[in-house]
From Swiss-Prot:
Gene3D superfamilies: FAD/NAD(P)-binding domain, GidA associated domain, C-terminal subdomain, tRNA uridine 5-carboxymethylaminomethyl modification enzyme MnmG/GidA. Disulfide bonds: none annotated. Belongs to the MnmG family. The lineage of its organism: Bacteria, Pseudomonadati, Bacteroidota, Bacteroidia, Bacteroidales. Keywords: Cytoplasm, FAD, Flavoprotein, NAD, tRNA processing. FAD binds at G11, A12, G13, H14, A15, G16. The keyword Flavoprotein applies. Pfam families: GIDA, GIDA_C_1st, SAM_GIDA_C. It comes from Parabacteroides distasonis (strain ATCC 8503 / DSM 20701 / CIP 104284 / JCM 5825 / NCTC 11152). This is tRNA uridine 5-carboxymethylaminomethyl modification enzyme MnmG. One of its GO terms (molecular function) is flavin adenine dinucleotide binding.
Amino acid sequence: MTFNYDVIVVGAGHAGCEAAAAAANLGSKTLLITMDMNKIAQMSCNPAVGGIAKGQIVREIDALGGYMGIVTDQTAIQFRMLNRSKGPAMWSPRAQSDRARFIDCWRGILENMPNLSIWQDMVQELIIEHGQVCGVRTGMNVVFRAGAVVLTNGTFLNGLLHIGRTQIRGGRIAEPAATGLTEQLISLGIQTDRMKTGTPVRIDGRSVHFDEMEEQPGENDFHKFSYMDTSHRKLKQLSCWTTFTNEACHDILREGLPDSPLYNGQIKSIGPRYCPSIETKIVTFADKTQHQLFLEPEGEATQEYYLNGFSSSLPLDIQLRALQAIPAFRDVQIYRPGYAIEYDFFDPTQLRHNLETKQIRNLFFAGQINGTTGYEEAGGQGLVAGINAHINCHGGQPFILGRDEAYIGVLIDDLVTKGVDEPYRMFTSRAEYRILLRQDDADMRLTEKSYQMGLAKQDRYDLLREKKESRDAIIRFAETYSVKPQYINSGLEKLGTAPLSHGCKLFDVVLRPQTTLENLADLVPALRAELDKVPASRKEEIIEAAEILIKYSGYIKREQIIADKINRLENIRIKGKFDYNSIQSLSTEARQKLTRIDPDTIAQASRIPGISPSDINILLVLLGR
């Protein structure tokens, strides 16, 4: 049988869910194909969303009309704002989620979404006609035709699990690998390679001595992931727990190194640099006598815990004995061991910025198959791929986010311009404009753009306008209201800041590190009256947004000037204007890389590793610049 759709999304992980939802919400008749409907949006590793830079991506997904933030708020069992000791540009939200409820919540959203159908099956073949993807064929020999296909296969393409010397074919533990697609794509000229990731043991909480661990409770303030006016902290809030490995534990781990797939030659692919296995830690940091571990709850209705910091592919008996050498885990029982997994990925420099492959029209890649790691990075790519798959079917300009607009823009530009030689994880340090890309203002940066193309709906846009009007009113008040020393100095001294020598605008007082709008409102009744005008349900969020803009106004303006200068180079298009191999004045490396990556603009060309300033100057001269 044959069925017809506009967009087909293959794989229902975090990238696939966002891709399918975006395409369907924009009006495309969409099909989401997954091997197991009970594993939709499965949190394959830790049951947490967000973290450094990752939390900003989730806020951006939400601001654009995606669902990861909403689902996380609905299922969070602990919330924390990381990096509070640093400036707001570095603040990053993170939440522990109830793993089972996270799946149920996502499935409920997708099953009730207009324009979206779900099919349980394995895709084994793409239908390609005249250099363009036209559909897929499944393991049941069902043909689905479509104008665009988004592949979001995660770790399932020829996945191979390792536990000691035991090897198991699969995409996750006890789940089959996906076969056929990689081989077909190779035959079509797509370059592929292998990567590795891993996950820790899952522990039975009934066997843990919690009284010998340090408790880490969450925070219960107004912060959340979604900008929508939805409830959060709905579930019972649970603590995480910390402890440390010790020398006895390390000695047992060293015993197992001859059987470690990482050290006996079984695994040849590269794993994530910033999430090393416990065996890698004891080898790389041999002088360390302990490593911190975090025990994270999997949900409010289960005894299952995730042991963050103990990722391993060592034999089962070594993992268990090493854990039992730690006092809090001396009686530990586990639900399953840690394991490593190798899987196929595709060189992302074969993609355009809209995540469409250069070789095959209307075929999009998103998520871990592009060489990234993390739910958030996958979700951001999936959203962009789903939007652009819809655009390819119905017409319009590609949806591309700039490096000064979103961490998602930084992520995709890094992938398609620089490529990857190890699993890519987002950090704030990767963004040159991180003061512009704060977690508090993703809605201000992105929701208008999404609303104009029809993805963000009216209720989201109305909340944005309300927030902006209230925020800007506070800032205007601070810019125009004058304060006099005789009325405020005694209060300023109590706050630990110098008294005024003369009158000034309230804005200048807010700039001081010791002051906030709230503590100044206790000294300035007119400011209190202004703050009381803010909608009560979002009062803290809006006041915080106004305060950040005031305190960082100078830095924000300076960074925006730099971004505007760089964006002039983004406007100089070079795609299709050069036969790079014929430009002998370019270095050999430059000719090869420019030909392979085929950058759209001078700015993108300048970010390709190995392209020198002199190479860029040659191109500018040839353009008459």
